[in-house]
């Protein structure tokens, strides 16, 4: 199943902010910026991708990416689809072409993992309108 992107809000990855205990993934639409908070490992994985620093051994995200490459699967898009008590939820859409057949699979995933894979695959990030409305805006001074 594919989500109708005409009702979705396009989101751009802005940056990550890391502390000693958590990572904030800053996302932005045309109207506002908001943060998705996650663990340090997710932040390190995004940072490694952005700086193109390869770790000695593959990270979990790199491992997943190797599986995708082997199965000829690509990340089509991600959708941040729900917000409950400051916890975001996401769906990742995977695409596999086999000859004339096209398979699209929708999977529940953590936003941090979804965003990391979207950045790796240069896939678009979207947000459901109600999630965007309820996301707490970050002030530019806090960034």
Please place each PLM-identified region on the residue numbering.
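Divalent-cation
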Residues: 1-143
């Amino acid at each position: 199943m594919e989500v109708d992107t005409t009702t979705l809000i396009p989101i751009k990855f802005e940056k990550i902010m890391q502390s000693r205990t958590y990572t904030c993934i800053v996302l932005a639409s045309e109207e506002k910026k908001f943060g998705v908070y996650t663990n340090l490992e997710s932040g390190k994985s995004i940072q490694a991708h952005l700086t193109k620093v390869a770790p000695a051994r593959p990270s979990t995200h790199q491992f997943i990416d190797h599986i995708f490459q082997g199965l000829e699967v690509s990340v089509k898009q991600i959708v941040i689809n729900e917000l409950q008590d400051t916890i975001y939820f996401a769906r990742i859409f995977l695409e596999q072409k086999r000859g004339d057949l096209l398979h699209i699979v929708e999977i529940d995933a953590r936003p941090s993992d979804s965003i990391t894979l979207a950045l790796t695959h240069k896939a678009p990030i979207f947000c459901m309108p109600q999630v965007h409305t309820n996301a707490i805006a970050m002030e530019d001074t806090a960034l």
